[in-house]
A protein has these predicted regions:
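Short, well-ordered secondary-structure micro-motifs within conserved domains or adaptor modules
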Residues: 31-41
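Charged, amphipathic alpha-helical segments and their flanking helix caps
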Residues: 1-27, 40-116
């Protein structure tokens, strides 16, 4: 059964925005691969039972090894996301382990205010 509610709606908004930018967005780690954006589960701060401040980390994944070519891809993709309607509050370069492989990545935090 697919998820419903404000958390699922927030993930869907992020995923659709990333796709509209011509990027590949995935929510299932089994489908994560280089040149995709892996959307993590949300964290949140609740104000009332009707309002929440939702944060979602998106991993921009590049091809190994972590050389200049992958760095260029990460910075270009990050710039594309920053130029969108997404409310990006921060980010940092990292390595993401998918299966047994380390992928160069950039972790981007996106915030969404959600209301029922």
């Amino acid at each position: 059964m697919p998820a419903t509610g404000i958390f699922a709606d927030s993930i869907t908004k992020i995923k659709n925005t990333i796709k509209a930018l011509g990027l590949v967005a995935v929510t299932d780690p089994r489908n994560a691969r280089p040149l995709t954006c892996l959307i993590e589960m949300p964290t949140y701060t609740q104000f009332t039972n009707q309002v929440a401040d939702i944060s979602v980390v998106v991993h921009i994944l590049a091809t190994p090894p972590g050389n200049q070519e992958s760095g260029d891809y990460l910075m270009t993709t990050l710039d594309t996301l920053m130029d969108s309607e997404l409310a990006i509050t921060g980010g940092s370069p990292t390595l993401v382990v998918i299966g047994a492989q380390e992928l160069p990545a950039y972790d981007v935090t996106i915030r969404i205010g959600a209301q029922r």
